Protein backbone atom coordinates (compact mmCIF):
# COMPACT_ATOMS: atom_id res chain seq x y z
CA UNK A 1 0.00 0.00 0.00
CA UNK A 2 1.24 3.47 -0.89
CA UNK A 3 2.34 5.63 2.02
CA UNK A 4 0.92 9.15 1.66
CA UNK A 5 1.60 12.26 3.67
CA UNK A 6 0.73 15.95 3.58
CA UNK A 7 3.29 18.55 4.61
CA UNK A 8 1.99 21.77 6.11
CA UNK A 9 3.78 24.60 7.87
CA UNK A 10 3.26 27.02 10.70
CA UNK A 11 3.31 29.83 8.12
CA UNK A 12 4.52 30.58 4.63
CA UNK A 13 8.30 30.63 4.10
CA UNK A 14 9.09 28.39 7.08
CA UNK A 15 10.88 25.67 5.12
CA UNK A 16 8.15 23.30 3.93
CA UNK A 17 10.05 22.59 0.72
CA UNK A 18 13.37 22.14 2.52
CA UNK A 19 11.69 19.64 4.85
CA UNK A 20 9.81 17.95 2.01
CA UNK A 21 13.04 17.42 0.08
CA UNK A 22 14.63 15.98 3.22
CA UNK A 23 11.67 13.63 3.67
CA UNK A 24 11.90 12.45 0.06
CA UNK A 25 15.63 11.86 0.40
CA UNK A 26 15.21 9.92 3.65
CA UNK A 27 12.39 7.77 2.25
CA UNK A 28 14.40 7.05 -0.89
CA UNK A 29 17.30 5.92 1.30
CA UNK A 30 14.90 3.46 2.95
CA UNK A 31 14.23 1.92 -0.46
CA UNK A 32 10.92 3.54 -1.34
CA UNK A 33 9.93 4.72 -4.81
CA UNK A 34 9.22 8.33 -3.89
CA UNK A 35 7.52 11.26 -5.52
CA UNK A 36 6.74 14.77 -4.32
CA UNK A 37 3.51 16.53 -5.29
CA UNK A 38 2.97 20.30 -5.21
CA UNK A 39 -0.60 20.53 -6.51
CA UNK A 40 -0.86 24.32 -6.18
CA UNK A 41 2.02 26.79 -6.38
CA UNK A 42 2.02 30.56 -6.73
CA UNK A 43 5.13 32.57 -7.37
CA UNK A 44 6.60 31.16 -10.57
CA UNK A 45 8.90 32.28 -13.35
CA UNK A 46 8.47 31.98 -17.09
CA UNK A 47 10.99 29.64 -18.70
CA UNK A 48 11.37 28.16 -22.16
CA UNK A 49 9.23 25.28 -20.86
CA UNK A 50 6.52 27.56 -19.46
CA UNK A 51 5.79 28.74 -15.91
CA UNK A 52 7.90 26.92 -13.36
CA UNK A 53 7.81 27.13 -9.56
CA UNK A 54 11.08 26.63 -7.68
CA UNK A 55 9.47 24.60 -4.88
CA UNK A 56 7.85 22.20 -7.33
CA UNK A 57 11.13 21.86 -9.23
CA UNK A 58 12.91 21.00 -5.97
CA UNK A 59 10.36 18.25 -5.27
CA UNK A 60 10.78 16.97 -8.80
CA UNK A 61 14.58 16.81 -8.38
CA UNK A 62 14.35 15.01 -5.06
CA UNK A 63 11.81 12.38 -6.15
CA UNK A 64 13.28 8.99 -7.02
CA UNK A 65 10.53 8.32 -9.57
CA UNK A 66 10.89 10.66 -12.58
CA UNK A 67 7.74 12.62 -13.39
CA UNK A 68 6.87 15.38 -15.87
CA UNK A 69 6.50 18.80 -14.31
CA UNK A 70 2.76 18.88 -15.03
CA UNK A 71 2.29 15.78 -12.86
CA UNK A 72 4.16 17.37 -9.96
CA UNK A 73 2.46 20.78 -10.17
CA UNK A 74 -0.89 20.91 -12.00
CA UNK A 75 -1.72 24.46 -10.88
CA UNK A 76 1.08 26.99 -11.37
CA UNK A 77 0.47 30.72 -10.91
CA UNK A 78 2.84 33.57 -11.62
CA UNK A 79 2.18 35.98 -8.76
CA UNK A 80 3.53 35.08 -5.30
CA UNK A 81 0.24 35.58 -3.48
CA UNK A 82 -2.53 33.48 -1.96
CA UNK A 83 -3.65 30.85 -4.50
CA UNK A 84 -7.31 31.93 -4.45
CA UNK A 85 -6.28 35.46 -5.43
CA UNK A 86 -3.81 34.33 -8.09
CA UNK A 87 -6.31 31.92 -9.62
CA UNK A 88 -9.03 34.59 -9.73
CA UNK A 89 -6.67 37.07 -11.39
CA UNK A 90 -5.68 34.52 -14.03
CA UNK A 91 -9.25 33.30 -14.53
CA UNK A 92 -8.29 29.72 -13.73
CA UNK A 93 -10.28 28.16 -10.90
CA UNK A 94 -8.65 25.51 -8.71
CA UNK A 95 -10.70 22.30 -8.93
CA UNK A 96 -10.31 19.91 -6.00
CA UNK A 97 -11.10 17.00 -8.32
CA UNK A 98 -8.03 17.86 -10.41
CA UNK A 99 -5.87 17.82 -7.28
CA UNK A 100 -7.24 14.41 -6.33
CA UNK A 101 -6.81 12.95 -9.81
CA UNK A 102 -3.20 14.08 -9.80
CA UNK A 103 -2.64 12.40 -6.46
CA UNK A 104 -4.25 9.15 -7.69
CA UNK A 105 -1.95 9.14 -10.71
CA UNK A 106 1.16 9.43 -8.54
CA UNK A 107 -0.10 6.87 -6.04
CA UNK A 108 -0.51 4.36 -8.85
CA UNK A 109 3.20 4.64 -9.67
CA UNK A 110 5.03 5.33 -6.39
CA UNK A 111 4.85 3.68 -2.98
CA UNK A 112 5.72 6.86 -1.02
CA UNK A 113 3.93 10.07 -2.05
CA UNK A 114 4.47 13.39 -0.30
CA UNK A 115 2.10 16.28 -0.96
CA UNK A 116 3.30 19.75 -0.02
CA UNK A 117 0.76 22.45 0.67
CA UNK A 118 1.01 26.17 0.00
CA UNK A 119 1.35 28.66 2.84
CA UNK A 120 -0.21 27.44 6.08
CA UNK A 121 -2.91 24.96 7.01
CA UNK A 122 -5.96 27.04 6.08
CA UNK A 123 -4.61 28.59 2.87
CA UNK A 124 -7.63 29.39 0.66
CA UNK A 125 -7.82 27.76 -2.78
CA UNK A 126 -11.10 29.49 -3.64
CA UNK A 127 -13.86 31.44 -1.92
CA UNK A 128 -15.28 28.16 -0.60
CA UNK A 129 -12.31 25.76 -0.40
CA UNK A 130 -9.16 25.69 1.72
CA UNK A 131 -6.18 23.36 1.45
CA UNK A 132 -7.30 21.91 4.79
CA UNK A 133 -10.67 20.97 3.26
CA UNK A 134 -8.98 19.01 0.50
CA UNK A 135 -6.57 17.27 2.88
CA UNK A 136 -9.51 16.27 5.05
CA UNK A 137 -11.34 14.85 2.02
CA UNK A 138 -8.23 12.85 1.11
CA UNK A 139 -7.68 11.77 4.73
CA UNK A 140 -3.94 12.40 4.48
CA UNK A 141 -1.71 11.98 7.53
CA UNK A 142 -0.05 15.32 8.30
CA UNK A 143 3.57 16.28 8.93
CA UNK A 144 4.08 19.75 10.41
CA UNK A 145 7.09 21.91 9.58
CA UNK A 146 7.94 24.46 12.26
CA UNK A 147 10.18 27.32 11.25
CA UNK A 148 12.07 27.90 14.50
CA UNK A 149 11.75 31.62 15.20
CA UNK A 150 9.99 34.00 17.56
CA UNK A 151 6.26 33.20 17.55
CA UNK A 152 6.63 29.64 16.30
CA UNK A 153 5.37 28.02 19.51
CA UNK A 154 1.96 29.66 19.27
CA UNK A 155 1.72 28.97 15.53
CA UNK A 156 2.71 25.33 16.04
CA UNK A 157 0.11 24.81 18.77
CA UNK A 158 -2.62 26.45 16.68
CA UNK A 159 -1.80 24.34 13.63
CA UNK A 160 -1.59 21.10 15.60
CA UNK A 161 -4.97 21.87 17.16
CA UNK A 162 -6.52 22.58 13.76
CA UNK A 163 -5.22 19.29 12.37
CA UNK A 164 -6.63 17.45 15.38
CA UNK A 165 -10.01 19.17 14.99
CA UNK A 166 -10.07 18.06 11.35
CA UNK A 167 -9.86 14.48 12.56
CA UNK A 168 -6.53 13.86 10.86
CA UNK A 169 -3.46 12.19 12.35
CA UNK A 170 -0.48 14.45 13.00
CA UNK A 171 2.18 11.80 12.50
CA UNK A 172 5.29 13.90 12.99
CA UNK A 173 6.89 17.32 12.93
CA UNK A 174 10.17 18.77 11.72
CA UNK A 175 12.08 21.69 13.22
CA UNK A 176 13.62 23.87 10.53
CA UNK A 177 16.25 26.32 11.76
CA UNK A 178 15.68 29.51 9.80
CA UNK A 179 18.77 31.25 11.15
CA UNK A 180 21.86 30.36 13.19
CA UNK A 181 20.74 29.17 16.65
CA UNK A 182 20.18 31.97 19.15
CA UNK A 183 20.48 31.97 22.93
CA UNK A 184 16.96 30.58 23.45
CA UNK A 185 17.05 27.98 20.69
CA UNK A 186 17.23 24.99 23.03
CA UNK A 187 14.34 26.27 25.13
CA UNK A 188 12.20 26.78 22.03
CA UNK A 189 12.86 23.20 20.91
CA UNK A 190 12.17 21.80 24.36
CA UNK A 191 8.85 23.65 24.49
CA UNK A 192 7.88 22.53 20.99
CA UNK A 193 8.63 18.92 21.91
CA UNK A 194 6.34 19.26 24.91
CA UNK A 195 3.38 20.97 23.22
CA UNK A 196 3.24 19.27 19.81
CA UNK A 197 1.38 15.95 20.15
CA UNK A 198 3.52 14.09 17.62
CA UNK A 199 7.08 12.75 17.38
CA UNK A 200 9.93 14.98 16.25
CA UNK A 201 11.28 13.52 13.00
CA UNK A 202 14.36 15.70 13.06
CA UNK A 203 15.89 19.16 13.12
CA UNK A 204 17.25 20.65 9.92
CA UNK A 205 20.04 23.08 10.82
CA UNK A 206 20.55 26.50 9.31
CA UNK A 207 22.18 25.83 5.93
CA UNK A 208 22.25 29.29 4.40
CA UNK A 209 21.22 29.76 0.77
CA UNK A 210 19.69 27.04 -1.45
CA UNK A 211 18.98 24.55 1.36
CA UNK A 212 16.56 22.60 -0.86
CA UNK A 213 19.58 21.50 -2.91
CA UNK A 214 21.44 20.13 0.12
CA UNK A 215 21.62 16.53 1.36
CA UNK A 216 19.15 17.12 4.19
CA UNK A 217 17.70 13.62 4.49
CA UNK A 218 20.50 12.78 6.91
CA UNK A 219 18.90 14.98 9.56
CA UNK A 220 15.65 12.99 9.72
CA UNK A 221 14.58 9.76 11.38
CA UNK A 222 11.50 8.27 9.70
CA UNK A 223 11.13 5.35 12.09
CA UNK A 224 8.04 6.93 13.76
CA UNK A 225 6.35 6.95 10.34
CA UNK A 226 7.37 3.35 9.73
CA UNK A 227 5.73 2.32 13.01
CA UNK A 228 2.53 4.30 12.42
Curated annotation (Swiss-Prot):
Uppermost EC category: ligase
Protein role: Catalyzes a mechanistically unusual reaction, the ATP-dependent insertion of CO2 between the N7 and N8 nitrogen atoms of 7,8-diaminopelargonic acid (DAPA, also called 7,8-diammoniononanoate) to form a ureido ring.
Lineage, top ranks: Bacteria, Pseudomonadati, Pseudomonadota, Gammaproteobacteria, Enterobacterales
Record has Cytoplasm as a keyword: yes
CDD domains associated with the record: DTBS
Protein name, UniProt field: ATP-dependent dethiobiotin synthetase BioD 1
Reaction(s) this enzyme catalyzes, per UniProt: (7R,8S)-7,8-diammoniononanoate + CO2 + ATP = (4R,5S)-dethiobiotin + ADP + phosphate + 3 H(+)
A cellular-component GO term for this protein: cytosol
Pathway(s): Cofactor biosynthesis; biotin biosynthesis; biotin from 7,8-diaminononanoate: step 1/2
Sequence positions that bind Mg(2+): 17, 55, 116
Sequence similarity: Belongs to the dethiobiotin synthetase family.
Binding locations of substrate: 42
Residues at the active site: 38
Family matches, as PANTHER family: DETHIOBIOTIN SYNTHETASE (PTHR43210:SF5)
Any one GO MF annotation of this record: magnesium ion binding
Any one Gene Ontology BP term: biotin biosynthetic process
Quaternary structure annotation from Swiss-Prot or TrEMBL: Homodimer.
Chain positions recorded as ATP binding sites: 13-18, 55, 116-119, 176-177, 205-207
Primary location group: cytoplasm
Amino acid sequence: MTKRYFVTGTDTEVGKTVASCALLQAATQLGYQTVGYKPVASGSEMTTDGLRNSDALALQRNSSLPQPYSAINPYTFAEPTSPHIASADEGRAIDAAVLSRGLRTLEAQADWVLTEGAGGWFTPLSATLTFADWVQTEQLPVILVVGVKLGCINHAMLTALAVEQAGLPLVGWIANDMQPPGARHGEYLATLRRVIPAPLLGEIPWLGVSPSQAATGQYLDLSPLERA
